[in-house]
Design a protein with these regions (language model features):
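Active-site-proximal helices and loops of the catalytic beta/alpha 8
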Residues: 20-36, 46-55, 65-67, 72-79, ...
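Short, compositionally stereotyped local motifs that mark structural "simplifiers"
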Residues: 426-512
């Protein structure tokens, strides 16, 4: 009986843990792994290559909605059509699973963007029928809220002779899609199956629920209970009281984005609606109008300073970006309780600085439930002290951060534009101001002794061995040169003993541009013509002439088929090539759907299948034997002693390539990893 009782207690404890909505005392940091129209930077294949670099800093990555939409052009996914088809504008389901597996191998969880307030249809009322584990799921017209789309849907339903739900929308109406009736048993069954699919089959760790103002929080609690998900956060874009009410509606089974924390930061910086409206007033950060300040709700506070709905998109869609002091805003957020969510454009622009901020947060042991104390709140200077599980961290932000000086119990570890970090000396640790990562050139790193012993020195090695009293020794505040790939280990030297060792892994490697080749075969399409136009671009440049692009007349015969091809130069490590094949200008000319060729050589067969009048393509790269090379460049090692390296398309490299891939060297294929 005792054993049975213990088992029941354990099961109840486990269920309660998942019912928290967001773990208590959680020390992780989340990254929003996309921004608006970030099709280049948020491809699953691109993000997968970044997993190693995120390790130890990022614990969760919120991914863009990964389901297939009905549109053929690239879309962000906020008008979902398919649930169980996970091929999206960001990559295939296979690539998505590979990304999530790579994340997990690096201790990173993936958060799915779950858009279930509304759903797109084919016409007014037709939802797709999808089969999962032998069961076919399909929403019906009777699953659409009675007053959807300002009653326009009801008017159309009367014309078409179809029925809608008898239940009214529980919240805000989303125009342009069908608002789903979450009271419907059919809807609940489908969404629960969908969420289990995301968690169990795709591998997601948690859910970010989109537009939860549109339906009751009780449904989120129900869905999370059915799925047993560990992490859940809702987008309830409203005032603090309304957000708290929503969290309570979920029975605290979901966290929420702390929108008012974001507005505190925006107002302190003095910007609004893409305009600078005032000089900064950093004292506005001293606010009780947010989730983060409340000891009862800070566990459920997902703090952020900008996201895809606030960033500058275009002159026609300026929205509400920060515009200035992005680093100071992140420094403040990353030193405070709640679970911080870093925006991808900030991560890309200031990765080194943000990594160091995260390292300081983790070193101090700050969690989503840590307590903090205000130390200064002036117009030009604001300081908070946060008490972590391991040490205390003081963040100072403002136009004059020198206005605040902490006690002698603190050591300054970071300094940047309008921000400073001070770590309590009780941490007894060495510190380096350059975080682990990849760098394209050497740098100088500053070492700091964070110790209550004023005589503490620093000892370090760069070969990965643990430093000893006999290792290279420097005083606190000294800088050292890092000129090549190495593992830096630095520790405190006090009375002949080495403690507080920190490890930093540096890869110093300049990016070397390289060339990829994209091949197209149009044999399946009748009357395509004697040329294929390639229109290719990415977020930084257009590779070809303006639409319809550049005509590719050069061909190669591979596997008995004629392939048109074109070379493209990859100029940065995260650059990709988007491409459309077409017949040129003119009425009735054929073209394909948008394709993402990534940053490696690809082979596409243009098929006869069309999507909204555009031809689809099949990626057959994996089917091409020896990647389609019919003959390697001839190298006469005995006579010419030519030691050059060549790409698979035959381009001669100036030196041995640094970029991973397959190359031809001395007449043989060589793999650079």
């Amino acid at each position: 009986m005792k054993k049975i009782y213990s088992t029941l207690v354990a099961l109840l404890a486990t269920a309660n843990m998942f019912a928290q909505g967001w773990p208590a005392n959680y020390s992780g940091v989340m990254l929003q792994g996309f921004s608006w129209d970030s099709y280049d930077y948020s491809q699953w294949t691109v993000l997968e290559k970044q997993a190693d670099d995120m390790k130890g800093f990022i614990d969760l990555v919120w991914l863009p909605q990964s389901g297939k939409c009905i549109e053929t052009e690239k879309v962000m996914g906020y008008k979902p059509y398919y649930y169980f088809n996970q091929n999206s504008s960001f990559g295939t389901e296979v690539e998505l699973k590979s990304l999530i597996a790579k994340f997990k191998a690096n201790g990173i969880g993936a958060i799915a963007d779950v858009v279930v307030n509304h759903r797109n249809t084919d016409g007014w009322f037709t939802f797709p029928a999808e089969t999962y584990k032998g069961v076919t799921y399909q929403m019906l017209s009777t699953d659409i809220c009675k007053n959807d789309d300002g009653n326009k849907t009801a008017t159309q339903a009367t014309k078409d002779g179809v029925s809608l739900s008898q239940n009214y929308d529980e919240g805000t109406d989303f125009r342009g899609c069908r608002d789903i009736d979450h009271k419907s048993a059919n809807v609940q069954k489908i969404i629960k199956a969908y969420l289990k699919f995301l968690k169990e089959d795709i591998g997601y760790t948690g859910f970010r629920y989109d537009m939860v103002k549109g339906f009751s929080g009780t449904h989120v609690a129900d869905y999370n209970d059915a799925t047993g998900v560990k992490f859940s956060v809702g987008e309830y874009w409203d005032g603090n009281e309304s957000i708290i009410n929503w969290i309570n509606k979920t029975n605290k089974k979901s966290a929420a984005f702390d929108f008012q924390f974001r507005y505190n930061v925006r107002d302190a910086i003095g910007v609004k609606d893409n305009k600078i409206v005032s000089s900064p007033n950093w004292s506005k950060l001293k606010s009780d109008y947010n989730l983060m300040h409340d000891p009862v709700y800070r566990q459920y506070a997902i703090t952020f300073v900008e996201n895809h709905d606030m960033q500058f998109r275009s002159a026609d869609e300026p929205l509400d970006p920060l515009k200035r002091d992005t680093l100071a805003a992140n420094a403040y957020m990353l030193a405070m309780p709640g679970t911080p969510c870093v925006f991808q454009p900030h991560w890309r622009a200031y990765k080194q600085e943000i990594k160091s901020m995260i390292e300081a947060r983790k070193l101090a042991g700050i969690t989503n439930m840590s307590n903090y104390t205000n130390k200064m709140a002036q117009t030009n200077c604001f300081a908070n002290e946060t008490t972590g599980d391991k040490a205390k961290l003081i963040v100072v932000v403002g136009n004059n951060t020198k206005a605040y000086t902490p006690s002698a119990d603190y050591a300054q570890i970071l300094e940047g534009y309008h921000y400073r970090y001070y770590l309590s000396k009780s941490a007894e640790t060495a510190w380096c101001n350059i975080p682990s990562g990849e760098y394209e050139a050497g740098f100088r790193a500053k070492l700091t002794a964070v110790s209550q012993n004023s005589n503490a020195k620093l000892v370090y090695t760069t070969d990965g061995t643990a430093p000893t009293a006999k290792s290279k020794q420097v005083a606190t505040g000294s800088t050292i040169n890092i000129d090549e790939t190495c593992t830096l280990k630095v520790g405190l030297l006090i009375n002949g003993n080495v403690t507080g060792i920190r490890t930093y892994n540096y890869t110093v490697k300049a990016f070397e541009p390289y060339t990829i080749t994209v091949y197209a075969n149009a044999d399946q399409v009748t009357n395509w013509g004697s040329a294929i136009y390639f229109y290719a671009w990415n977020s930084s440049e257009t590779f070809t002439k303006a639409w319809p692009g550049t005509a590719a007349t050069a061909t190669k015969t591979l596997n008995g088929k004629k392939w048109y091809y074109m070379d493209f130069k990859i100029k940065s490590k995260d650059a990709i090539v988007n491409i459309i094949f077409n017949q040129g200008n003119g009425t009735g000319k054929k073209q394909t759907v948008d394709l993402n060729a990534g940053n490696s050589t690809k082979y596409y067969e243009i098929t006869t299948t069309q999507s909204n009048g555009k031809y689809t393509c099949k990626d057959v790269t994996a089917d091409m034997p020896t990647t389609g090379i019919t003959a390697a460049p001839t190298i006469d090692n005995t006579a010419s002693k030519d030691n050059a390296w060549y790409t698979l398309s035959g381009m001669k490299m100036m030196q041995k390539p640094n970029q991973p891939g397959i190359y031809i060297h001395q007449g043989k294929k060589q793999v650079i990893k």
